[in-house]
C-alpha cells in the first residue's frame, strides 16, 4: 500500500522516448512517439512499482500504454533524462506532491500502430529538432535527446 501523499512527497516515475531510425543514417532518429491526452501530448510513463527498477518501469509502462513489447524495444545505452515538477489532483480531495520522472531512449525498427489503453490517441512525429511541443516537459527531453544523438554521431 502506498503512503499518503503530502506536498513534500516525491513520487518516482519512469518513461520511454521511443524512436525509429532513419533508413539512410542509423545514427539519427527518423520519428518519435507521443501519446495524446485530452489536452496535451505525453510519453508512455508511469509510477514505479515496489521492487521495480526505473528501466523496468519504463518498459512495463510502454507496453501497458502502447502494446509495444519490451522484446521489440532496444534500449539506447548512455541516455537518461530526469525532471521534477509539482502535481496537484483535485479529485476526490486536493492532493499535491512532486513527481520525478526519469526517461530513457528506446528504438524500434519501424513506426507501427499503437494500442491506446490510457490515451485518446498517438502520433509518430518526424524527428526535426528543435521541437516545440510542451515547453516544461517534452521539449527539454527532446533537446537533451537531440544533443545525445549529435554527440553519438560525432564519436562514431
Question: What kind of feature is each model-predicted range?
Answer:
Residues 11-13, 38, 96-101:
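Short connector loops at helix/strand junctions that flank enzyme active sites
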Residues 15, 31, 121:
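Conserved beta-strand and immediately adjacent loop positions that scaffold enzyme active sites
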Residues 1-24, 93-94:
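Acidic, metal-coordinating catalytic segment for phosphate/diphosphate chemistry
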Residues 42-46:
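A short gly/proline-enriched turn/hairpin at secondary-structure junctions
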Residues 6, 47-48:
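Short, surface-exposed loop/turn motifs that are enriched in glycine and acidic residues
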Residues 48-140:
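Unchanged
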Amino acid at each position: 500500500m502506498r503512503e499518503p501523499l503530502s506536498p513534500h512527497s516525491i513520487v518516482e516515475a519512469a518513461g520511454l522516448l521511443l524512436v525509429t531510425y532513419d533508413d539512410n543514417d542509423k545514427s539519427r532518429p527518423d520519428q518519435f512517439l507521443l501519446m495524446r491526452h485530452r489536452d496535451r501530448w505525453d510519453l508512455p510513463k508511469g509510477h514505479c512499482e515496489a521492487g521495480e527498477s526505473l528501466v523496468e518501469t519504463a518498459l512495463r509502462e510502454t507496453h501497458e500504454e502502447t502494446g509495444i513489447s519490451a522484446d521489440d524495444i532496444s534500449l539506447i545505452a548512455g541516455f537518461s533524462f530526469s525532471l521534477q515538477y509539482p502535481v496537484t489532483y483535485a479529485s476526490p480531495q486536493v492532493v499535491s506532491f512532486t513527481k520525478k520522472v526519469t526517461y530513457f531512449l528506446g528504438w524500434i525498427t519501424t513506426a507501427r500502430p499503437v494500442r491506446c489503453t490510457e490515451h485518446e490517441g498517438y502520433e509518430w512525429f518526424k524527428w526535426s529538432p528543435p521541437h516545440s511541443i510542451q515547453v516544461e516537459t517534452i521539449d527539454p527531453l527532446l533537446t537533451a535527446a537531440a544533443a545525445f544523438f549529435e554527440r553519438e554521431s560525432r564519436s562514431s
